[in-house]
Structure formats: C-alpha cells, structure tokens
From Swiss-Prot:
Cited function: Catalyzes the addition and repair of the essential 3'-terminal CCA sequence in tRNAs without using a nucleic acid template. Adds these three nucleotides in the order of C, C, and A to the tRNA nucleotide-73, using CTP and ATP as substrates and producing inorganic pyrophosphate. tRNA 3'-terminal CCA addition is required both for tRNA processing and repair. Also involved in tRNA surveillance by mediating tandem CCA addition to generate a CCACCA at the 3' terminus of unstable tRNAs. While stable tRNAs receive only 3'-terminal CCA, unstable tRNAs are marked with CCACCA and rapidly degraded.
Gene Ontology process terms (BP): RNA repair; tRNA 3'-terminal CCA addition
Keywords from the named record: ATP-binding, Hydrolase, Magnesium, Metal-binding, Multifunctional enzyme, Nickel, Nucleotide-binding, Nucleotidyltransferase, RNA repair, RNA-binding, Transferase, tRNA processing
This protein's name: Multifunctional CCA protein
Subunit annotation: Monomer. Can also form homodimers and oligomers.
Binding annotation for Mg(2+): 21, 23
UniProt family annotation: Belongs to the tRNA nucleotidyltransferase/poly(A) polymerase family. Bacterial CCA-adding enzyme type 1 subfamily.
Kinase in keyword set: no
GO MF: ATP binding; CCA tRNA nucleotidyltransferase activity; cyclic-nucleotide phosphodiesterase activity; magnesium ion binding; phosphatase activity; tRNA binding
HD domain ranges (all copies): 226-327
Catalytic activity: a tRNA precursor + 2 CTP + ATP = a tRNA with a 3' CCA end + 3 diphosphate; a tRNA with a 3' CCA end + 2 CTP + ATP = a tRNA with a 3' CCACCA end + 3 diphosphate
Cofactor details (free text): Magnesium is required for nucleotidyltransferase activity. Nickel for phosphatase activity.
Obligatory cofactor(s): Mg(2+); Ni(2+)
Length: 415
C-alpha cells in the first residue's frame, strides 16, 4: 500500500499558494485493508475513506470509463492493480495530475510542472471530453488563476467547444456550485468570458449571452456592447467587495436590455423592471439561493434609480427604502450601493470615477432611520396611522436634511 498527495494541494504548493485541503490517493490497497486500519468509508459512488485522525480524504486508485451521457455516466473501477499513472490519467488538467510521495518526490507523468511554469491549463487526455462538467471547471480555474496569467491551451479550448451539446444534461445544482465557487475568485468575469468563448454561455446562461451585440448609448457606455459592460461590471464588483451576492447581482443587472426591440436601440428605457422576470427565471432554473435571487431582482429593478439618488424627492427615497426592505434588512442598502457603483464604474473610462450617490444614500438612510415607530406611537398614533405618520415624519426629516445640504453647498460656492 502506497499513499500519495495529489491534486490541488500539490498544484497550489508548486504555485506557492495557501493549501486549504489535502487529498490523497492510495495505490495497492483494498477497501477491507483501509477499514482494518481505521479509515471510515464515505464515498457513495467511489472508494473514498476518511483518515481516522486527520479526517483528510483518501481515495483508492481508480480508472473511469464512459458509460452514458452527462457527468454521471461513468463506470469506475478501483483495484489494487490500478497504477498511480492510470489514476492521474483520469484527471482533468495536467496541473491537477501531479502526485507527491511520502519522501517529497513528485510524480508527474503528464508534464503538469511544465504547464505550471508556462501557465497553461491543458487537459490530460481525450477522456476530458467525456465529462461536460469539466468545461465549467476549466472556466473556474481560468478565473481563479487569471492573476497568475494562466490561459487555456488552444487544443483544450477546441475540445471544450466540441462539448457544448452535453452541457444541458448537467444538473442545475452542479452548474450553480461551479458558478458560486467562481464568484468568490478575484476575477469571476473570466469564467463567463471563457464560457462565451467556447459556446457554453449560450447553453447555460442564455440571458447573459443575449446581451452581447446589444448596443448602449456611446455617451454613457463607451464600450458600447452590453455584454462587455456586464463583464466589466462583474470585474468591478470583485474589486469592490467579496460579497458573492453583490457580484451575482451585477451579472444580472442589465438582462432586461436583451428584451429591448431593435428599433429602439441604443436606448433601453424601462430595462430594469423588464429584467426582473428574466432574473427570476434564471435563478429558478439554476436553483440559485433565495438571498442571492432577491438581491439580484431588486438590483435589476432599481439600479438606475440609485444612479440619480441626489435628485430623488424625500417621498421617492422613502418608497425606495421600503421597496428594498432596508428597515428590516439595513445591510441590503450597502449591497445595492456596491452593485450600483460597480455598474457605474464598469464602463470604459469610468473605472476610477467616484460614486457620490453611495454616501448620499447612506446619509439619507441614517436620517430617515433616526425617526422611529416608537416616537410615533408615543405621540398617540395607532394602527394603520403609525405607518402613515412614520413615512410622513421620515419624509419631513429628509426634506429638512436636503435643505441643509443645499444651503451648505451654496455657502461653499460663495466662499
């Protein structure tokens, strides 16, 4: 029995990145021998065991053979006779097919170290094409390692382009899991660009793919193309926040523009509310968690309103705050502001512009929140009157605050 460290732990160690978890492959062992040594069997479909002390995963060396469609259509064969090289051959990319033995020696039959040095994401063998989920995995690795200048090998991209027919067979949960993990990387926009380059975006995210080729007014969008703007917005969101809900919301914020009749281009009046049903359909299909869905829909509906925040009347501001439920969920306002700032700065030439609307909305919410329902009830109001009076007083507080702001600005100009 021989044990080897494999996969991401070896790869990340070679890249001098933090190693978050370690996976092992065991050659020359049977399930009975693993159990006898105290390992716990956890693999439903594969012979995977947990170490009795470290709780790290140890998998028996295995091979896989295609038996049907999709990512589940495989027959696995695990046996003490399966070699390390055979086990590594079934892996997706050469950089993930390197093993390290207990003396620190690297076993690298598919030149993964060379591809790490040259920054290539390259498939190990043609068996790569048997699992459509690998299209998403490669796109995720491209996003994860974009800051290290990794790129997809041309022959791997060509193979990915041939695999799009099986993508609709992927379970929505698997598509979302890869997407969710990608949204947490520093360059999530690369994932969606790779999916577009290989033809997978149209199959998996048709709502986003439809934005490419849809023009916006050059005055406000020098990049013109709404698809390009969307990816720029996702990129900007990743610079502004680690919150994947905000990042996902920026992906969806302009999907309504794909519904604009061509004769109205490049104007997209009302695209925000129009996009809400599109966002809801996308989220339902991919089983996106409700908190992310809810933020994405309100960002789609209201992001244009936030861009003109300073010109909103106190009445409209209170309506906006109520619509996005910030009284009960104050953190949502910050998410909305970040998504809208990413939208405003996700444009060619606007990347370093300030977004004063953000501080204006934060201050406006602070002023409105200073009026409480307790104050209204103490003044003798009850029932439905409480809500009406609360809104009136909050509008009054905002009106007074806005006048002070305007007077202060006037005095500054005169000085």
């Amino acid at each position: 029995m021989k044990k080897y460290l494999v996969g991401g732990a070896v790869r990340d160690g070679l890249l001098q990145l933090p190693v978050k978890e370690r996976d092992w492959v065991v050659v020359g062992a049977t399930p009975q021998e693993m159990l006898a040594q105290g390992y716990q069997h956890v693999g439903k479909d594969f012979p995977v065991f947990l170490h009795p002390d470290s709780r790290e995963e140890y998998a028996l060396a295995r091979t896989e053979r295609k038996s049907g469609q999709g990512y589940t259509g495989f027959i696995c064969y695990a046996s003490p006779e399966v070699t390390l090289e055979e086990d590594l051959r079934r892996r997706d990319l050469t950089i993930n097919a390197i093993a390290r033995d207990d003396e620190g020696n690297l076993i690298d039959p598919y030149q993964g170290q060379q591809d790490i040095r040259q920054r290539w994401l390259r498939h190990v063998s043609d068996a790569f094409g048997e699992d459509p989920l690998r299209v998403l995995r490669v796109a995720r690795f491209a996003a994860r390692f974009a800051h290290l200048n990794f790129r997809i090998a041309p022959e791997t991209m060509a193979l990915m382009q041939q695999m799009t027919d099986e993508l609709p067979l992927l379970a929505p949960e698997r598509v979302w899991k890869e997407t969710e993990r990608t949204l947490a990387t520093r360059n999530p926009q690369v994932y969606f660009q790779v999916l577009r380059d290989c033809g997978a975006l149209k199959a998996l995210f048709p709502e986003v793919d439809a934005l490419f080729g849809v023009p916006a007014p050059a005055k406000w969008h020098p990049e013109i193309d709404t698809g390009i703007h969307t990816l720029m917005t996702v990129s900007m969101a990743a610079r502004l926040t680690d919150d994947i809900a905000v990042r996902f919301a920026t992906l969806c914020h302009d999907v309504g523009k794909a519904l604009t009749p061509r004769e109205l281009w490049p104007s997209h009046h009302g695209h925000g509310p129009a996009g809400v049903k599109v966002v809801e359909a996308l989220c339902q299909r991919l089983k996106v968690p409700n908190p992310l869905r809810d933020l994405a829909t309100i960002v789609a509906r209201y992001h244009d309103l936030l861009h003109g925040a300073q010109s909103l009347t106190p009445k409209t501001l209170i309506k906006l705050f109520s619509a996005i439920d910030v009284w009960r969920r104050p953190a949502r306002l910050e998410q909305m502001i970040l998504a809208s700032e990413a939208d405003a700065r996700g444009r060619t030439g606007f990347e370093n512009h300030a977004y004063p609307q953000g501080d204006f909305l934060r201050d406006a919410f602070r002023v409105a929140s200073s009026v409480s329902a307790r104050d209204v009830m103490a003044a003798g109001f009850s029932g439905a009157q409480i809500g009406e009076e609360l809104n009136r007083r909050r509008q009054q507080a905002l009106a007074s605050w806005k006048r002070q702001q305007e007077n202060s600005d006037t005095e500054t100009i005169q000085d």
